[in-house]
A protein has these predicted regions:
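Proline/glycine-rich low-complexity loops and linkers
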Residues: 51-55, 62, 81-170
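Conserved short beta-strand edge segments in small beta-sheet-based binding/regulatory domains
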Residues: 236-251
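A general structural motif
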Residues: 4, 64-65, 211-213
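Glycine-rich beta-strand-to-loop/alpha-helix junction loops that act as flexible
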Residues: 12-14, 70-78, 219-221
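An accessory alpha-helical subdomain
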Residues: 144-236
Length: 251
């Protein structure tokens, strides 16, 4: 388990990129993370290309705080590359037949588990299993950080919830303020520059008719720090004589 995790999603699906299917994983994962006080650092939608999958997995692995959910490619067909690539990147290329996974597959399919379905029990070394509520063929995780689930949402979603509940149930509370400034971003850039670089900050410009407004969001885990810089920003806006509307003060 990672103490200060950065969450990533890798959605493997040529059929999403060519328009044959719509992605349902990003929105679901985001919702489950936000419910627990987490958020994603990055999300990738990529083709079923083992070389490129390896590059993306290695990129995620370089972040020492990374926690990844990979969707798709863990079935039994020739274009399911995820188990092999995951083993190469996350367990030194070692794949072993997971006895519990094999038992689940045989119990589910009987004689029809052979010769192909049993290959879904060949997992990266020391994998943990994630329950499949649809057909009992498990997803898996490595190092309590890198989780691999099917591309089918009805299977994947329960596994995501299981992994989060087991290993990343809840973050410490994040404090924030959110308000509208009735000006362009250009008018308040100097105020923005005054904020500490390590503070979470975003500005979202919008148009209401022909008028420009900016939605400001400031957040941090330190309550007093958030209060200080939210009040600073608002007071500087007031000093410039610019109207503002407070949406929320959570500190």
């Amino acid at each position: 388990m990672v103490k200060n995790p950065s969450f990533y999603s890798v959605i493997i699906g040529t059929e999403i990129l060519n328009g044959r299917r719509k992605d349902k994983h990003f929105e679901f994962l985001n919702k489950e993370l936000l419910k627990r006080g987490w958020e994603q650092k990055a999300s990738f939608v990529i083709k079923d290309d083992p070389s490129f999958m390896e590059d993306v997995f290695n990129l995620v692995k370089k972040d020492e705080n990374s926690v990844m959910f990979s969707f798709g490619g863990i079935g039994a067909t020739p274009d399911d590359y995820t188990r092999e690539v995951a083993a190469k990147v996350f367990s030194n290329g070692i794949i072993e037949q997971n006895k519990k996974a094999l038992e689940l597959i045989i119990n589910q399919f009987g004689k029809e588990a052979y010769p192909h379905r049993v290959n879904m029990a060949n997992l990266p070394k020391n994998s943990i299993l994630l329950k499949n509520v649809v057909n009992n063929v498990p997803g898996f995780g490595v190092d309590e950080r890198f989780f691999f689930v099917p591309g089918f949402p009805e299977m994947a979603q329960h596994m995501v919830i299981e992994a989060l509940n087991r290993f990343y149930p809840k973050n410490i509370k994040k404090y924030s303020c959110n308000f509208i400034v009735h000006s362009s971003e250009n008018d308040i850039i100097e105020i923005m520059k005054s904020l500490p670089l390590d503070m979470e900050f975003s500005s979202l410009p919008k148009f209401i008719g022909d008028k420009r407004i900016v939605e400001i969001y400031i957040a941090d885990f330190d309550k007093n720090r958030v209060k200080k810089w939210c009040e600073f920003f608002k007071s500087e806006v007031d000093r410039k004589g610019i109207k503002k509307d407070v949406l929320s003060d959570d500190f």
